[in-house]
């Protein structure tokens, strides 16, 4: 509602203080505070009728990241979880040495100190967990750095001989320990992660892509000197280097705990969006779309904007908007998606779908179709049990 689905004719307590502006596409209007993205509306398919029934961050993020409702208790690293979209798509790519099948940046998603489920490979197994990588540059959201010691830092200045020596020693230990182990353990999962990290450090195209200082200064500036922009720039460089799937978190790491900028605007929605969140989002996303087009990559690169849910149409007493999964907007670009279109609509107040209601599962099915994957494909978990990867139907966006 604050970005892709303005409601200029709604009552004041619903529409808020933001105005709407024309875009590059006749008849499509965006929020006034994303003027740069508005110039690229011809590349975007806006879906204004997504909805689900999960009102909490943990559950809302899970259903959007996996395309399935949570069943029972869900844990961040649970192997009974449905795999994330990134893990699912990466499963269909042929492995290449030194190039991870999926990367996520710059840190994990948290809600009030608890890591959220939905970013891992779940029942596909640890082999398909996206590699967590730091963004090496940019001002953090709200000045708060959410890094832990779990993110891979490819900027380490290690000589090849040192990495080789360490890997040889670890392999010797592995051979000894391997005689005492049977099925996959947490140690095995860590071992896979470590080997991938070593491969990337040893001259992989991924490590070269990670060095943002090698990028044209004009392009770096186009994305903005902020973690949000530099993360999207790194995303483009990683895709160029051969990484099939990149997931970028454009927010502070914790939605409800501590400081930092995030989209959970229960208080002071309008100044926070206007002064801190939308300027970074507008510059970074518009730069990514322009950059991909300039390099001839947009037709073969699918860009998908996901979130947990929308915000309440009516402004609360704290000048904020609360959780609202009843209807919200998402956007897609590239990868065969026809730009300059809007699918579905919300009602006059932005409270519920008015036409062509769709679900996160339908968004996932659309992504699978764009990637050349049949949404009805069956995959097997580590125990050999079959699962159809998606229950949704692709949207007619092509």
Language-model-detected regions and their locations in the chain:
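Ligand-binding pockets and gating/stacking loops
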Residues: 1-398
